[in-house]
A protein has these predicted regions:
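Surface loop/turn signatures of beta-propeller and other carbohydrate-active proteins
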Residues: 1-35, 54-57, 71-98
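Entry beta-strands of beta-propeller and related beta-repeat scaffolds
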Residues: 43-46, 102-105
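Short glycine/acidic-enriched loop and turn motifs that connect beta-strands
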Residues: 52-55, 110-111
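Beta-propeller blade signature
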Residues: 64-67
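Conserved small/polar residues in nucleotide/adenosyl-binding loops
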Residues: 112-117
Length: 122
């Protein structure tokens, strides 16, 4: 799922001439809530909900951009894509923290079930 999103962006990215100068924008698709705004290894990281395949809402992925000056942002590969049964609707709001020297992402997922005994709800 991650590679599919990254490949789509490589083929359908928005040209830099069409983007604002000082605002974070996705390389392709639709952008929503900022998440995981953090400093890691001396750089500022911004993760955000987005759907890379259309300019409308879809199963949320997490985009990722990095800056050193809060003006020039570098797009990184898609950080998260909904690729599990429990997050197939999307990877929603969350945070980024440093733990044991690693950048750890925490997010919200949503699972609907009619089976109250479903193990994935425990």
């Amino acid at each position: 799922m991650l590679e599919k999103a990254n490949e789509y962006i490589r083929q359908n990215y928005i040209d830099e001439k069409e983007k604002p100068l000082f605002h974070v924008t996705p390389e392709a698709g639709w952008m929503n809530d900022p998440n995981g705004f953090s400093v890691y290894q001396g750089k500022v990281h911004l993760f955000y909900q987005f759907y890379p395949y259309k300019t409308e809402w879809g199963p949320m992925h997490w985009g990722h951009q990095v800056t050193e000056d809060l003006l020039k942002w570098e797009a990184y590969p898609v950080a998260m894509a909904p690729d599990q049964d429990y997050d197939h609707i999307g990877c929603f709001s969350g945070s980024a923290v440093e733990a044991d020297g690693k950048h750890v992402l925490l997010y919200t997922c949503l699972l609907y079930t009619s089976d109250a005994a479903d193990d994935s709800l425990r």
